Amino acid sequence: MADFDTNPTSLYSIKGIVILDQDGNRVLAKYYDRTTFGTVKEQKAFEKSLFSKTSRNTSADILLLDGVTCLYRSNVDLYFYVLGSTRENELFLDATLTCLYDAVSVVLRKNVEKKALIDSMDTIMLIIDEICDEGIIMETDAQAVVQRTALKSDEVSFSDQSVSQIGFSFMKSANEQFKWSLLK
């Protein structure tokens, strides 16, 4: 991974995305800058410091902490953070944070709370991967991100379907395969 501070790219990039709960505990974190956040211990220490600064000051939504530009947004029991270089354009960091929050809000049906987020963690991870690839901001349109991460009707898990729906789907598929084998 490239050093984000000494090797600038022409692409907009971030150092990490973090979601903490109301107690400052990590719910989800994805760091892209291995020089600033090399170990889990360093990450946790940064998160603790970040939470202590942001939980007291709910009026601001941006701060500079340890040479990292931090944009954040709080909701019922969650804090969403986008971390960037001090040279990074704050408007793009804000667009990334807004995209993350809006996409999560759509997926969770506006129920942006810790329990709902944990229940949909797989989709939330997909959202983060669609927004950012190895630190490079790829998308800032929440609707586009949600569309790309939405499950297709054929990909719905068995737990989300009734037994009759699974049986009907299986029979329909078997029937189509049988028809094609007869036509050959």
UniProtKB/Swiss-Prot annotation:
The keyword Cytoplasm appears for this protein: yes
CDD domains attached to this UniProt entry: Zeta-COP
Entries under PROSITE patterns matching the protein: CLAT_ADAPTOR_S
Keyword Manganese: no
Lineage: superkingdom: Eukaryota
UniProt GO BP: embryo development ending in birth or egg hatching; intra-Golgi vesicle-mediated transport; intracellular protein transport; oocyte development; retrograde vesicle-mediated transport, Golgi to endoplasmic reticulum
UniProt keyword annotations, A-Z: Cytoplasm, Cytoplasmic vesicle, ER-Golgi transport, Golgi apparatus, Membrane, Protein transport, Transport
Localization per Swiss-Prot or TrEMBL: Cytoplasm; Golgi apparatus membrane; Cytoplasmic vesicle, COPI-coated vesicle membrane
Pfam families in the record: Clat_adaptor_s (PF01217)
Topology class, membrane: Peripheral membrane protein
GO cellular component term of the entry, any: COPI vesicle coat
Similarity section: Belongs to the adaptor complexes small subunit family.
Function: The coatomer is a cytosolic protein complex that binds to dilysine motifs and reversibly associates with Golgi non-clathrin-coated vesicles, which further mediate biosynthetic protein transport from the ER, via the Golgi up to the trans Golgi network. Coatomer complex is required for budding from Golgi membranes, and is essential for the retrograde Golgi-to-ER transport of dilysine-tagged proteins. The zeta subunit may be involved in regulating the coat assembly and, hence, the rate of biosynthetic protein transport due to its association-dissociation properties with the coatomer complex.
Quaternary context: Oligomeric complex that consists of at least the alpha, beta, beta', gamma, delta, epsilon and zeta subunits.
Protein name: Probable coatomer subunit zeta
Annotated source species: Caenorhabditis elegans
